Design a protein with these regions (language model features):
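Bacterial N-terminal signal peptides
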Residues: 15-27
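Sec/Tat signal peptide C-region and signal peptidase I cleavage site
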Residues: 29-33
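Flexible internal linker/loop segments at domain or repeat junctions
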Residues: 427-450
């Protein structure tokens, strides 16, 4: 028994716009180039960029011409990034769809231009509820669908939505399941769902007889799902670092939901969860995967190849090959990893971002990635030689202390500029020159963002009209828009009088989704939709 669905007519909050205004909003969306948002932060590089936004410009994003269009209400907190599908063939005609999931184990498709409910589905089986918060306030009061889904949409198809849902039987048993939903109907596909289970050779936490066992009660799927080469990859975080737990990555064949590969990155140790403030695993064009592992055991005894002899990679920047199954092929570990692990100043609170190939002053091309965590340092690694573990850090570049307050978020990238939102700090804009970061930010916002900082998204029309968007975790939540070059504020949702653009309470790790002239932002009760006012 999979998702149970029903269709519905228009459902909007009291702040929804009038029917005529909805029609006016719909018209431009159908007349411009249509862009899907199918995965966390727009693409597998996780750069947060929609470079084909032709409607929103530096000139029209202001409180006089831009604002809230409608809100949609769901049955739980929205922790995952909303996704967007254009021109889906539904029972009521061709529609642009906004895909939203909740911590109450529900998935929704709304008309992305009007807010009308197209379908709603539940992941719960008879006798089940969403998981309780496991005594941990990180995701509370219930745990259902936490991570951002991923959508597979081959040409001329409606698309398949892959998501992970956590639930609990009245008997007390916990389940994690992978679902595949028809984007047009919400109906289950590929004989789904499948219960998620795994084992891996090792003697670490929750092992028996030389095998580590995945216990679904001990984990939550925080990391956005990754789809490459017909495989959906999942990565697992713990509940408040409550042992026993280890670092799991799993792959499932997208077309069958059969498990095809499993890797544990702390199999003979403990901890090493994958958080990333909800960031998805990152992948390059050769299907290598990159991520930042959290505090956990690192085996500093290295083998002849320079890798931990026991295969334990706590608090590391990791590269995995997917050819023939998951395997660690490169890594970077801080020289002071033991101290960072003990003081909980690990890398795991941030996500990894892949940069486009860059040319240095000598004409050499570099394939780079960036990452940062709780220690306030900004790390740039060479993806073809990340640095390993040494008595001093030997990665490509380190900006020590560049991110005061630490990172519990994901950066964004556009046109040789890198944008980070540290805790309690402004959004900082760093510039690359000759394949190196300049040592100090070239711009920053006036606004500082309280915990967990900000994860920016960027819209642009090619190299023009670039706008940095960010959501503020406050009550009410605030959507901000900044000129991407200067970080001068263009708009925020508190500017209009009478609370015109307020859209609900904020939530941590929220990421604005920009598609076809609209901006969608999650809250504790639903999603606010913004665009040009009628």
């Amino acid at each position: 028994m999979g998702f149970l669905t029903h269709s519905a007519f228009l459902r909007r909050s009291s702040s929804s716009i009038a029917l005529l205004a909805c029609f006016l909003c719909l018209a431009p969306a159908l007349s411009h180039s249509q862009q899907d948002v199918l995965t966390y932060h727009n693409n597998n590089s996780r750069n947060g960029l929609n470079s084909k936004e032709t409607i929103l410009t530096l000139a029209n994003v202001n409180s006089a011409t831009f604002g809230k269009l409608f809100t949609v209400t769901v049955d739980g907190r929205v922790d995952a990034q909303p996704l967007y599908l254009h021109a889906v063939s539904t029972a009521n005609g061709t529609q642009n769809l906004l895909i939203v999931v909740s911590e109450h184990d529900s998935a929704y498709a709304f008309n992305a231009d009007t807010g009308a409910l197209v379908w709603q589905a539940t992941a719960l089986k008879t006798g089940e509820t969403p998981s309780d918060d496991r005594g941990c306030g990180q995701v509370s009061p219930e745990i259902g669908i936490t991570s951002t889904p991923v959508i597979d949409r081959p040409k001329n198809s409606n698309g398949v939505i892959y998501l992970v849902a956590m639930s609990k039987y009245s008997s007390g048993n916990y389940h994690q399941r992978l679902h595949a939903l028809d984007a047009a109907t919400g109906n289950e596909l590929h004989n789904g769902p499948v219960d998620i289970s795994a084992t891996y050779p090792g003697t670490g936490d929750n092992s028996s007889g030389g095998v580590v066992i995945f216990d679904p009660a001990q984990y939550k799927e925080r990391s956005g799902l990754l789809l490459i080469d017909d495989t959906v990859y999942l990565a697992w975080a713990s509940h408040c670092d409550d042992r026993p737990y280890t670092g799991w990555i799993m792959g499932y064949k997208a077309s069958t939901l059969a498990q095809t590969t499993v890797l544990n990155v702390t199999p003979n140790g403990n901890e090493g969860a994958i958080w990333g403030a909800g960031a998805g695993l990152t992948a390059d064009a050769d299907n290598n995967i990159y991520f930042l592992d959290a505090n956990g055991y690192f085996d500093s005894t290295l083998n002849a190849g320079g890798f931990p002899s026991e295969g334990d990679y706590g608090n590391a920047f990791l590269k995995l090959s997917t050819k023939g199954g998951l395997a660690v092929t490169d890594y970077f570990e801080m020289f002071n990893q033991e101290s960072e692990n003990g003081s909980d100043t690990d890398l795991g609170s941030g996500g990894a971002l892949l940069l486009p190939a860059m040319k240095d002053a000598q004409g050499n091309l570099w394939d780079l990635a960036v990452g940062a965590g709780k220690d306030s340092n900004l790390y740039v690694v060479n993806r073809n030689g990340m640095g390993g573990f040494n008595s001093t850090n030997k990665m490509y570049q380190e900006l020590a202390g560049a991110l005061p307050g630490g990172i519990w978020s994901m950066p964004a990238y556009f046109d040789s500029r890198l944008y980070y939102g540290p805790v309690g700090q402004p959004i900082l804009e760093f510039a690359f020159k000759s394949a190196k970061l300049l040592p100090s930010p070239v711009a920053q916002t006036v606004k500082a963002f309280a915990y967990p900082g900000a994860t920016p998204s960027i819209s642009a029309n090619g190299d023009a009209d670039a706008i940095v968007w960010a959501s503020e975790n406050s009550n009410p939540a605030v959507l901000h828009a900044f000129n991407a070059k200067t970080l001068v504020e263009l708009y925020n949702s508190n500017q209009a009088s009478g609370g015109r653009d307020q859209f609900g309470a904020g939530n941590k790790f929220i990421i604005p989704t920009i598609a076809n002239g609209k901006v969608y932002v999650g809250t504790t009760t639903g999603v606010g939709a913004f665009g040009l006012l009628p």
